[in-house]
């Protein structure tokens, strides 16, 4: 059951000029469900992305990297994205690569563009052949119903074990020009740092030079999708894509040092964080949304390292599910996080406003009923003070319930 999942009104998902979306029911894995998405981008847009660090990456990830490398080398820009659910096209070897390229070629033929201008994405079951003929057969319908307002349908078309579609949108003013941003994401399990069974697509109408967009997508991913964890597994297919359509009146952003870049980064990060947090709120079997903040570190990297040790711990996550204030498990996770010179005698631990541990030991004033009161909440904040610097980092995670096991045990049935 999703945790405090906000209601998404399709009418409040702003169309982004220069971007249209269409979907189809292609029976990739199950009948009568949206399972193919096509996103078309008008000429002149810039597109960039970051992808899984799993060495067993899926075939479409390999093809996306190839096509974006050609764009960065001066080739024609990306004009379309195609996404299928129900099959990951991962662990499929050379036939899988051939199918990913065949998908691009077929969409390119139908749309009148080059195969290298298409980025393919797949999500679903690993180690099964992609039903390429069914996927290709769905492309004409997806192209036919493209519209700028189809963001909510698009969010539905990329769902797998998600229980709800995930989308976010906002408009901001930069240097007196209105910029529209809208995005969708999917994911409910196998989520950890460097992304995982996670797809995110975020479009906006600012005009951004390719090298600047390449920097922006990495920066935004590091502040959003790389700050979430559900079960600590890294998947084969995760991808986060930014589309800058260039249709707004704001002059091109050509430098990462410009005030306009800083303003755009703030806006894109806000939408990306909303999309990332929706994934955690819809985590498989999740009943609680947990924010873990580590402060007072020597570097943001070590703060995030400790935060993830807490967020990945099955013992910590099951304690939250049970509302059991066995909070020594958090201290243990801090201790094995791998920060070699950590002085545990300086560490304070808070659960919301409750000081649980002070200077590395139990706070004499701490009462277990206070800890349990917080742990019964559906929204919980864990705060760790390291006392060794000024850096900090925040991640978002969820608890681990019986339903998580059931969902994953029954995934293919």
From Swiss-Prot:
Pathway the protein takes part in: Amino-acid biosynthesis; L-arginine biosynthesis; L-ornithine and N-acetyl-L-glutamate from L-glutamate and N(2)-acetyl-L-ornithine (cyclic): step 1/1; Amino-acid biosynthesis; L-arginine biosynthesis; N(2)-acetyl-L-ornithine from L-glutamate: step 1/4
TM ranges? none
- The feature of type site (Cleavage) is located at 196-197
Q: Where in the cell is it found?
A: Cytoplasm
Task: Name the Pfam families on file.
Answer: ArgJ (PF01960)
Q: Which CDD domains match?
A: OAT
User: Principal place where this protein is found?
Assistant: cytoplasm
Q: What is its EC number?
A: 2.3.1.35, 2.3.1.1
Q: What is this protein called?
A: Arginine biosynthesis bifunctional protein ArgJ
């Amino acid at each position: 059951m999703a945790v405090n999942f906000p209601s998404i009104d399709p009418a409040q998902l702003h169309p982004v000029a220069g971007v249209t979306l269409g979907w189809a029911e292609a029976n990739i894995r199950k009948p009568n469900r949206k399972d193919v998405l096509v996103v078309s981008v008008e000429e002149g847009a810039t597109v960039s992305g970051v992808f899984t660090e799993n060495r067993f990456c899926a075939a479409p990830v390999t093809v996306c990297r190839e096509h974006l490398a050609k764009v960065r080398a001066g080739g024609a820009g990306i004009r379309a994205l195609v996404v299928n659910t129900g099959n990951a096209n991962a662990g499929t070897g050379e036939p899988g690569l051939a199918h990913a390229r065949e998908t691009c070629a077929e969409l390119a033929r139908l749309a009148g563009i080059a195969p290298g201008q298409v980025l393919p994405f797949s999500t679903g079951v690993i180690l099964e052949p992609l039903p390429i003929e069914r996927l290709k057969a769905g492309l004409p319908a997806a192209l036919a119903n493209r519209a700028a307002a189809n963001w909510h349908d698009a969010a539905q078309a990329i769902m797998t074990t998600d229980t709800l579609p995930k989308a976010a949108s906002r408009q901001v003013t930069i240097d007196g020009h209105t910029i529209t941003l809208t995005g969708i994401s999917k994911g409910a399990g196998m989520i950890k740092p460097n992304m995982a069974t996670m797809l995110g697509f975020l479009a906006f109408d600012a005009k951004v030079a390719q090298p600047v967009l390449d920097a922006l997508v990495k920066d935004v991913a590091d502040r959003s999708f790389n700050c979430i964890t559900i079960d600590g597994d890294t998947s084969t297919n995760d991808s986060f894509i930014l589309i800058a359509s260039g249709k707004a009146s704001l002059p091109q952003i050509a430098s990462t040092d410009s005030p306009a870049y800083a303003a755009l980064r703030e806006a894109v990060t806000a939408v990306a964080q909303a999309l990332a947090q929706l994934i955690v709120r819809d985590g498989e079997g999740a009943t609680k949304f947990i924010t873990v903040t580590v402060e007072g570190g020597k570097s943001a990297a070590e703060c995030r390292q400790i935060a993830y040790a807490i967020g990945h711990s099955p013992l910590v996550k099951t304690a939250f599910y049970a509302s059991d204030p066995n909070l020594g498990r958090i201290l243990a996770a801090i201790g094995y996080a791998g920060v070699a010179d950590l002085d545990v005698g300086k560490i304070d631990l808070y659960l919301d406003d409750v000081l649980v541990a002070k200077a590395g030991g139990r706070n004499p004033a701490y009462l277990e009923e206070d800890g349990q009161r917080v742990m019964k909440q559906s929204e919980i904040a864990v705060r760790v003070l390291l006392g060794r610097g000024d850096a900090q980092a925040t991640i978002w995670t969820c608890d681990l319930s019986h339903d998580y096991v059931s969902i994953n045990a029954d995934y293919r049935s």
